[in-house]
Design a protein with these regions (language model features):
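Bacterial N-terminal signal peptides
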Residues: 44-54
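Intrinsically disordered, low-complexity segments enriched in serine/proline and basic residues
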Residues: 11-12, 23-24, 30-34
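Terminal presequence/propeptide segments associated with secretion/organelle targeting
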Residues: 56-645
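Bacterial N-terminal signal peptides that target proteins for export
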Residues: 32-45
């Protein structure tokens, strides 16, 4: 039986056989049935040779297991080699695609980061092109594992040309176990997670020259990772749109509802080429990303061929996945996926791929969110990943989505929040606030989401302790009116007072489209008050908190206990506060305040300013009084002065 030599295209072989048959007719006239037989024989020869080549290339294909896979190194790969790749186009069974090596691109994926450039052949792949979700699909050359499909070329490509991450680079991930140093790095805060730097929805925290920087957004169009879109299920289009900037700054491309998550059993085992999903949020709302398995054995698997987020050590649910359909698009073909039963945990997210281990449960953060209204109670139960960079954003988008996605939602809505964040080994972080549409037009639901995200950013932003979040509980009471009031004026009944005297402040609040409210506040001048000018600050709680944030102490890193203590001391926004300010030095040590220090003590402490938890300021708050809750979100500041005799 005739078979083509290695490296000769099969289509060319078919043409030569047919041409030889036609050439024979010039000299010899064969009976019709003989000619027909010869044509069928030629076709059978081609089919047999094709099967032989595919089987030879796939001998260590999807079924390959074991601790040491047979691999082929980049130095052994050259242009013209042919092999096979596997991916799922529909269902759960990987399908073969013919692979033709075009060459090797050196140092294009970082220092010493080589990429194998290949052209894919096959009816389906030539129709769909390189597909989002195909990254990780294993490539075999000479029957050995060469690597994973991981890169595509440009936009609107007319040919399915892809880049392959060498398997040797991916196997390095297996050597990265979760050492103590690695565990510590996994929870260190990133630039976009630090307190006070949680970007407003619609903005990003990307650095100049980053992939998200508008001036350089197209720099990587020549060769870039095959997209692994993060699919949002149970989310409104507005929620995804408003928070797209935050996810973009983390390297995520949000996609609305192109699949789902369920606990349905999928009896088929994972194999090389199978679809596998990493889950960031699961429950009544789902966020997941799907790529393909490159290598699998009894304990672990490697997938993607490029990073999901490149967070290093991670702790994400690893689920099987079923491809419902592959949608062809000139811009970007993608797979529509159902994520099914969990099988383990992704523990590494590295430059050349992600690694998961079987039979390990990930540590997620459980969230219970309740919305109380006149029509009853609606509850949402879900879990979010535990990650310094993404957890605050995931909580913001899920909270906004839950509040925005109920029928009771409207522009003239106020929420009363009673909530808590459980941190193992520390006191709960309590939250009691109100949120109403403000003068700047920001919806109450967005204010609530940002408030929660900012708290989580501060919990993660400490260099001393890795927070172990036990859970989040949020109870919202929905009021169908805008309960917001501005502090219009404040005055006192005296201009002079003595230490120990009681004075009365009269404040006027102007509610949104309502009658003015007058409140009288009794204030006692401290017996320790110094003679001279005493400033009286009448304000909302947010102003006092911002004054503390502006203090240099707020920019210094505190341990987790001090951070939680400060969070629990923050002021409610439905009260008026009266603060008495003296022109005496004040020292802050962590979450503790020492007001009105004598000059001698201040001079000593001033020399300790280098201490990361010691800050001396020139003004002291000697007393603070608050009204009872007003059932309005209060906004405004008034400053009065009296003379202490």
């Amino acid at each position: 039986m005739f078979c083509p030599a290695p490296g000769i295209p099969l289509l060319a072989t078919t043409y030569n056989l047919a041409e030889s048959n036609n050439a024979g007719r010039a000299d010899i006239v064969l009976p019709g049935f003989v000619a027909s037989f010869m044509r069928k024989l030629a076709l059978l020869v081609v089919v047999a040779c094709l099967s032989f080549i595919v089987l030879a290339s796939a001998q260590a294909g999807p079924g390959q297991t074991g601790q040491n896979p047979q691999i082929i190194t980049v130095s052994q790969i050259h242009a013209g080699m042919r092999g096979v790749a596997y991916t799922v186009f529909e269902g759960v069974k990987p399908e073969a695609m013919e692979v033709e090596v075009l060459g090797v691109l050196h140092n294009v994926n970082g220092p010493k980061g080589d990429i194998i450039l290949v052209r894919l052949h096959g009816t389906k792949v030539e129709y769909t092109g390189v597909v989002a979700g195909m990254s990780g699909s294993p490539v075999y050359l000479d029957g050995k594992l060469a690597g994973a499909l991981a890169f595509r070329i440009g936009e609107f490509s007319k040919e399915p040309i892809a880049g392959v991450t060498p398997i040797a680079d991916m196997l390095e991930i297996s050597a990265l176990d979760r050492s103590p140093a690695e565990e510590t790095s996994a929870v260190k805060p990133s630039l976009s997670a630090v307190a006070g730097q949680t970007a407003t929805p619609g903005e990003t925290n990307s650095l100049p020259g980053s992939a998200q920087d508008s001036d350089g957004k197209d720099f990587a169009n020549y060769l870039k990772p095959i997209e692994t879109p993060l699919v949002f299920n149970g989310f409104s289009e507005q929620a995804i749109h408003l928070f797209a900037g935050q996810f973009a700054s983390a390297g995520i491309v949000p996609v609305m509802g192109a699949g789902s998550v369920s606990d349905d059993k999928q009896p088929e085992p994972l194999e090389a080429g199978s679809a596998v999903s990493a889950v960031l949020v699961r429950g009544d709302m789902d966020i997941e990303a799907t790529c393909s398995v490159t290598y699998v054995d009894a304990q672990r698997l490697l997938a993607c061929g490029h990073p999901l987020l490149q967070f290093g050590s991670v702790d994400l649910p690893m689920n099987k996945a079923e491809v419902l359909a592959t949608l062809a698009s000139p811009l970007n073909s993608f797979k529509i996926v159902n994520t099914t039963e969990p099988v383990g945990t992704f523990v590494q997210d590295r430059h050349t791929g992600i690694m998961g281990v079987f039979d390990r449960q990930p540590e997620m953060i459980p969230v219970t969110l309740s919305i109380h209204s006149s029509t009853g109670v609606k509850q949402f139960h879900y879990e979010v990943l535990n990650n310094p960079k993404l957890t605050p954003v995931a909580l913001m988008v899920t909270v906004f989505n839950a509040l925005h996605g109920v029928n009771e939602f409207g522009e003239e809505i106020t929420y009363r929040l009673a909530g808590s964040i459980g941190v193992k080994g520390f006191p709960e972080v309590t939250m009691r606030n109100m949120f109403a549409p403000a003068e700047n037009g920001q919806p109450a639901a967005m204010q609530a989401a940002i408030s929660l995200g900012e708290r989580f950013g501060r919990i993660y932003d400490n260099p001393y302790n890795a927070p172990d979040i036990a859970g989040v509980k949020l109870d919202f009471d929905l009021v169908r009116e805008r309960r917001w009031a501005r502090l219009e004026s404040a005055r006192t009944d005296v201009t002079e007072a003595r230490p120990g005297d009681n004075i009365t402040l009269e404040t006027v609040l102007a509610p949104y489209r309502g009658e003015r409210i007058v409140r009288q506040i009794q204030v006692k001048i401290p017996t320790s008050a110094s003679k001279g000018t005493l400033r009286i600050l009448v304000s909302d709680g947010e102003t006092l908190d911002h004054m503390g944030h502006a203090n240099p102490a707020f920019g210094r890193k505190l341990d987790l206990a001090s951070t939680i203590a400060l969070l629990n001391k923050e002021h409610s926004n439905n009260r008026l506060y009266v603060s008495l300010l003296e022109a005496d030095p004040e020292a802050r040590v962590g979450d503790k305040v020492m007001p009105t220090l004598p000059i001698s003590i201040m001079n000593v402490m001033d020399g300790m300013r280098g201490n990361q938890e010691m800050v001396v300021s020139g003004e002291s708050s000697v007393d603070e009084t608050a009204t009872a809750p007003l059932d309005y979100v209060v906004s405004g500041v008034q400053l009065l002065t009296i003379t202490v005799k």
